[in-house]
Amino acid sequence: MKIITVTLAPNQAVLTCYLQDQSPKMPNAAIRPAMLVVPGGGYQYCSDREGEPVALAYMAQGFNAFVLRYTADATTPIDKALQDGAAAMDYLRANAAELEIDPQQIAAVGFSAGGHLVASLGTLLPQRPCVGLCRNAGRNVDRRWPPGARPARAG
């Protein structure tokens, strides 16, 4: 396994990349599906238990996995986290060959606030993942948008 850490603009979010080792005995597995893991934490922090352990579980299923530590603290509006999610998706697609992933097979899984972020990525921005899985998606997060900045709901 190879681990790469990338800092994403504009908010200095951190994307940790967990990449499978290539095996000459498995030439058809050179390009893998990707799973973007978005931990919860109430938009106040990113939970460690919903990051690397989840990424490793997806790696065991054949994915290359990526954990997004988005901008999160008590004073930051969630639009910054949404920017971080978009930056992560842009990075994955732009660097798909280097990361040995299929840009048409990028899924995202999020927990709690991370689930809300994945759902928001899937409905509000063009940088959406191919598939989004949300677990215990956050409630009462509308209050975190700055005045006048909350995007319109899709559909």
Model-inferred region functions:
Residues 29, 47-66:
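Short amphipathic alpha-helix adjacent to the substrate-entry channel of hydrolases
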Residues 1-30:
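N-terminal cap/lid segment of alpha/beta-hydrolase-fold proteins
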Residues 47-48, 68-103:
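Catalytic nucleophile-loop/oxyanion-hole region of alpha/beta-hydrolase
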Residues 45-49, 53, 76-83, 108, ...:
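Residues at secondary-structure transition points
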Residues 31-40:
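Short beta-strand element of the alpha/beta-hydrolase
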Residues 34, 59-69, 107:
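A fold-wide structural signal in alpha/beta-hydrolase
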Residues 87-155:
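Primarily recognizes the serine-hydrolase "nucleophile elbow" in alpha/beta-hydrolase
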Residues 42, 70-74, 140:
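Alpha/beta-hydrolase active-site loop signature
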